[in-house]
Amino acid sequence: MAVEDKVKTLYEDGIVALKGAFYVEWVEAMREDMMTAFWSAIQRPGGAVGRGPRRWYVEIHPQDFRGFADLAAHPWVVEMAGAVCGPKFEIVEIGFDVPFQGAKNQPWHRDFPSPTDTYVDKRITSLAFNLTGVDVTPDMGPFEIAIGTQWEDGRSWNHEMFPTKEEWPKFAERGVRKFPQRGDISCRSALTIHRGTAHGSPIARPVMVLGIDAPGAGHSALHDMMMTKDYHDALPETVRQHLICRVVETLVPISQKHDIEGLVMGAE
């Protein structure tokens, strides 16, 4: 499917995917890096942010993810980012979600308030690329997304992100649970209403998140990407030119800024 068709699907559904973008061996290394980063982050204040019971989000340094350059330079990622967010798109976030056994249904939500560019002008100005670390099965609390809801205004919602419970049935009717396999990439608007679901499996389900902005979208203020100069200089220029990050002598632990208060307790 041509990138134009993928963009059309994204604008209609709020999400689109590419199957088999990476080899399983590459994904296994990504999963190992995510879980190593999780066990480090959970031990320090602000390192892992709760997104509900037994569910966390962790931002990582790009150089702690061996596949960062591969992901940021992947032709489909670059094509989608350029087509949706423009040729000067910005890479503003790298991190991962991980639910464990006992994670509950999240409330239906979006990840930040909708800008007028989206709810008035019907333009998508930011993207989240997701890569699962495991082959997702029904007992792993699959990601559920309410198709086509990225255009909802949302200004009357709690924090402009959380629809009222009275509205949940509307989103449930449009909800589709996703079962990606290792190597797949999805691309979504984080404004499309979604939730993580109850996780009964003893196997954790980490999923990598690469955040992309159009210039001016402003989400870099929610993050603090940093890398050392030698790592930065070794990246391909095609990646470097899109990075919104600090170049530092020594990496320091990330203290996360994007805490979504309404997710802390879960929905049930």
Segments predicted by a language model, with ranges:
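Non-heme Fe(II)-dependent double-stranded beta-helix
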Residues: 1-13, 18-119, 223
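Generic beta-strand structural signal
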Residues: 87-94, 104-106, 123-131, 141, ...
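Short, structured patches in soluble enzyme cores that scaffold and shape functional sites
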Residues: 98, 110-112, 131-135, 147, ...
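Short edge-strand/loop segments of extracellular domains
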Residues: 100, 146-153, 211-217
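Active-site glycine-rich loop that binds ribose-phosphate moieties when present
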Residues: 110-117, 131, 163-171
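Short, conserved beta-strand element in jelly-roll/cupin
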Residues: 118-138, 179-182, 187, 210-214
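Double-stranded beta-helix
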Residues: 136-197
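Non-heme Fe(II)/2-oxoglutarate
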Residues: 192-268
